[in-house]
Amino acid sequence: MSSMGVLDPNNFLNQIGKDKFGNGHGDILIWKRKAEKYLCLSGLQYTIIHPGGLVDTDSSKQELVLDVDDVLMKMEKKSISRGDVVNLCIAALTESGNRSVSFDCIGKQRDAVEGGDSSVVSAEEAFRLFLSTGKTADYTLGPTGSE
């Protein structure tokens, strides 16, 4: 489990723990990205989930949108139900098929989904559909891409 926004070194989460001059500890998303990159290079199978902001709402009520490389940071609403993240974790355990993958996820109101599809699919189906795209995060991007 990680966070959306790991590609932006100026993300506000990187400022937590720093003083007004930028000194001190911090850079939580940069450290998360470094850990992800280390895992990817380890040769172990993995699934890395980058949820948007976690909210305490009912799960399975919104369309799950999965993509990579902070594309979803451009969305106006960048949150997801904690329960939906749990369901995606379970789906990753049961549906990954020995494949390593890293993705971002948010929940979207049904009427806001492009194409007008008002169906809400399960986390398992959303994950399977995402896997069929062949996408995964590009770990050459971001503040640690050249290290």
Model-derived features: where do they sit?
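Oxidoreductase cofactor-interface core, primarily capturing Rossmann-like NAD(P)-dependent enzymes
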Residues: 1-147
